[in-house]
Amino acid sequence: HIDVIFNKICEIKGLTDQLFDYSLACNEEALELDAPCNMESAIGDYLSEMAFILRENSFSLDIEKLIWKDFKITVNSNFLGRIFNNITNNICKYADKKAPVCISSIYRSKDAGIEITNHIADKSSLFNTTGMGIRNITLMMKQMNGRAIVSHNNTEFRITLWFSRA
């Protein structure tokens, strides 16, 4: 019984966190962004923390295509932490541990992206999600003058976080 109660508490906490993120992301006031900095400086620690948590949860990582270039972006550290926390939690819930989580970087002239791809463990689990976390990520990225592109099929989930050049 204690396991059931604990799982329900974790579920309620997750939903509460998502509602809080949503209220932050929907705030109409101009978001204060951090000073422009190199993409690795802005994102590297969040990716390292995500990698640590995923490895602790028995996931393997493929980071061969994660390359850092001299590319300045402007972010809000609070939002970025929430975004990567959400992505990490979703991977832990829905990803297949038998396939590596792939993290790569993409550079274009006016923007750069971090793409995270994983195989889906159980297709039916995607129907039990509210989708609020992805909506929150999309709203937060928009407030940072970026965007989140999400795609998935029956076997794979992909999210790309696009950051505008500062």
What are the roles of these predicted feature ranges?
Residues 98-110:
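Short beta-strand/loop element within the Bergerat-fold HATPase_c
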Residues 90-92:
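Short helix-loop "hinge" at the ATP-lid/N-box region of the Bergerat-fold HATPase_c
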Residues 53-64:
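Short conserved segments within the C-terminal catalytic ATPase subdomain
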Residues 146-147:
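Conserved glycine-rich
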Residues 141-142:
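Detector for a conserved hydrophobic position within an alpha-helical segment of the HATPase_c
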Residues 27-32, 70-75:
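Conserved micro-motifs of the catalytic ATP-binding
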Residues 114-132:
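Glycine-rich/acidic phosphate-handling loop/turn and adjacent ATP-lid/helix
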Residues 7-12:
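Short alpha-helical segment of the dimerization/phosphotransfer core of two-component systems
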